[in-house]
């Protein structure tokens, strides 16, 4: 059997002898061993367990849902200390079956065995402990409390853990249901949100102040914070796009202006004749200045000499010299200018000016025929055919009928071509003959015996 006894009792040796006589094994600690483990709760330094927890960067910044904390607090407050009462187990219930559990002696010893009554009697004969009555009673109370706590701890811990788990499940369900509720940001609600943000400033707006300005009870600070983050991100994106569009517009203007330093190109003239594949017409040459001879011209070898009295002097002394010729001015464009000219008018002798109409060059009429050249056939003169005189109406009708109904020679020639080349398609206007027409033509020509059609 097993007997447990504390080291506080002075008559441990006597009790060991009694237990040995009874055939039981006593487990305990001697006074020498107890001196080595003599410590109290005050000697334990709890600061080592929370070492370096005062630093802010050690613990992560966890998001704690206030709904869960408040739900736990409300559950504890409504229970009214039921958890504490569950842990308190009456001593009578534990010590009632003394025959099965054992006897509690004045020193707080528990004896487990069949002869526990005799062991308790032997303990009473010894006269108890040699300590004071007050100390003995205190030890008895401490031992009873320890036994009660040890025996009641499994059941009480199980019940309290089950209740805590059920409360946590209920609170998590309620908080989970609250988190799933989403806010429908209608255009009116978003407009009020934007007004509140603009009133506070985009950089100084905080969710609590926005919620106060909006004054809507269905919104929470978490909803405002989430929408504010999305609004700032969208606004930043739009500002970046506007800046990029402005930069592109500025670059396009700079390129269109030629970099700013180049002068603006003159507008193209709408009356310019388009030239496709031909160089632009050269500018008209300036009018040559008249040559003035103020002295006697030099004699050229081989030319006859002239009488100096007959040599004309230029300019004459009685005439006033003319001024410079006025610059050439192009003629005004006509009302319907041409936009194309024939290639033969591109020569230097026929350079079209601005607004020259497109018309054919007139052919000069030959007054006299060219003299015949031996060995060359003369070019025949083009003469248009004179239209015939208008005939009577009967002649015109007959001519139209002839034109509509071809002649028999042309029909025979076409039929001969078809018969000689049967693999070619029929010429335009010919159709394959029908059976009725062929039979009628044969009967008309006197052919009576016609073989039946094959197939």
Swiss-Prot record:
One MF term in the entry's GO annotations: DNA-binding transcription factor activity
Name of this protein: Probable transcription factor GLK1
Induction, as annotated: By light.
Function comment: Probable transcriptional activator that promotes chloroplast development. Acts as an activator of nuclear photosynthetic genes involved in chlorophyll biosynthesis, light harvesting, and electron transport.
Domain HTH myb-type as annotated: residue spans: 177-236
Taxonomic lineage of the native organism: Eukaryota, Viridiplantae, Streptophyta, Embryophyta, Tracheophyta
Cellular compartment(s): Nucleus
Composition bias type Basic residues, residue spans: 169-181
Tissues/organs with expression: Expressed in leaves.
Principal localisation: nucleus
The keyword Protease appears for this protein: no
């Amino acid at each position: 059997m097993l007997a447990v006894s504390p080291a506080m009792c002075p008559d441990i040796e006597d009790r060991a002898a009694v237990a040995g006589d009874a055939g039981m094994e006593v487990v305990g600690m001697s006074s020498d061993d107890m001196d080595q483990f003599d410590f109290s709760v005050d000697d334990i330094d709890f600061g080592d367990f929370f070492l370096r927890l005062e630093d802010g960067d050690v613990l992560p910044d966890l998001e704690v849902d206030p709904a869960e904390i408040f739900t736990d607090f409300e559950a504890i407050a409504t229970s009214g200390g039921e958890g504490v009462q569950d842990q308190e187990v009456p001593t009578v219930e534990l010590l009632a079956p003394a025959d099965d559990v054992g006897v509690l002696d004045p020193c707080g010893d528990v004896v487990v065995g069949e002869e526990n009554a005799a062991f308790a009697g032997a303990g009473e004969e010894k006269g108890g402990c040699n300590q004071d009555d007050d100390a003995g009673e205190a030890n008895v109370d401490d031992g009873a409390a320890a036994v009660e706590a040890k025996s009641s701890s499994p059941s009480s811990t199980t019940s309290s853990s089950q209740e805590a788990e059920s409360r946590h499940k209920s609170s998590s369900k309620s908080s989970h249901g609250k988190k799933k509720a989403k806010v429908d940001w209608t255009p009116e609600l978003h407009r009020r949100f934007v007004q509140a943000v603009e009133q506070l400033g985009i950089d100084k707006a905080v969710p609590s102040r926005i919620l106060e300005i909006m004054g809507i009870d269905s919104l929470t600070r978490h909803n405002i914070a989430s929408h504010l983050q999305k609004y700032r991100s969208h606004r930043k994106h739009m500002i970046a796009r506007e800046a990029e569009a402005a930069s592109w517009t500025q670059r396009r203007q700079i390129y269109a202006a030629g970099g700013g330093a180049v002068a603006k190109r003159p507008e193209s003239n709408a009356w310019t004749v388009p030239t496709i594949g031909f160089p632009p017409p050269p500018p008209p040459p300036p009018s040559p200045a008249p040559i003035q001879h103020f002295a006697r011209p030099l004699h050229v070898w081989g030319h006859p000499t002239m009488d100096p009295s007959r040599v004309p002097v230029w300019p004459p002394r009685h005439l006033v010299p003319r001024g410079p010729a006025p610059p050439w001015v192009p003629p005004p464009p006509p009302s319907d200018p041409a936009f194309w000219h024939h290639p033969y008018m591109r020569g230097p002798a026929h350079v079209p000016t601005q607004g020259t109409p497109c018309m054919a060059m007139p052919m000069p009429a030959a007054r006299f025929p060219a003299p015949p050249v031996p060995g060359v056939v003369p070019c025949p003169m083009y003469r248009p055919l004179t239209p015939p005189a208008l005939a009577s109406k009967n002649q015109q009708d007959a001519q139209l009928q002839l034109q509509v109904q071809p002649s028999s020679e042309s029909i025979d020639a076409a039929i001969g071509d078809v018969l000689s080349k049967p693999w070619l398609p029929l010429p335009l206007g010919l159709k394959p003959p029908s059976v009725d027409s062929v039979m009628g033509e044969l009967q008309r020509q006197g052919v009576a015996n016609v073989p039946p059609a094959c197939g």
